[in-house]
Amino acid sequence: MSHCRQHAGGRRDGQSPGGQDICHLGDTFWAASSGGGSYAGRVHLGLIAIVVREYDPAIRFFVDVLSFELVEDSPALTNDGRPKRWVVVRPPGAATGLLLARADGDDQAAVIGKQAADRVGFFLHVEDFGAAYARMRAARVRFLGPPRSEPYGQVTVFLDLAGNKWDLIGP
């Protein structure tokens, strides 16, 4: 029996460079060492932070334009006690969400729109590429080129409200 099956009935998807089995169950991946199990138990990526200028325009972009769900918008405090908001959005049915974090200071403001160093940093998979592309164009989303066919499907690059590059990918 593989180490993946021994831990929550997962399936083996390959092996890491360090020799650990890469296991998969549903949308959760984890590493299981050949020495007797997972070094960290089941692991999933819960949130990815995106630094934004202001919360409300970012919420409107992700919810109204990209059809994400607003999962949480709660008052919170910075590490030094100043007020902020805890804002999480995610695609419907997805396990991983985006934490919309308002820039706090010049260093954080400097990375707005550059979080992936001018590379595509985010990948949005859709079931109906044509409909998603048309809806986003109607909402005046900035695309960096026309859709193209790749071995994995249709793809085009767009910018989010902050200027981060995303791939829109569909069949």
Predicted feature descriptions by range:
Residues R11-D13:
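Intrinsic low-complexity, disordered N-terminal segments enriched in polar/charged/small residues
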Residues G35-I59, V120-F122:
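N-terminal beta-strand motif that seeds the catalytic metal site of vicinal oxygen chelate
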Residues A49-T96:
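Core segments of cupin and vicinal oxygen chelate
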Residues E54-D56, V111-K165:
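Vicinal oxygen chelate
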Residues V89-G93, F158-L161, P171:
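Active-site beta-strand termini and strand-to-loop segments that position acidic
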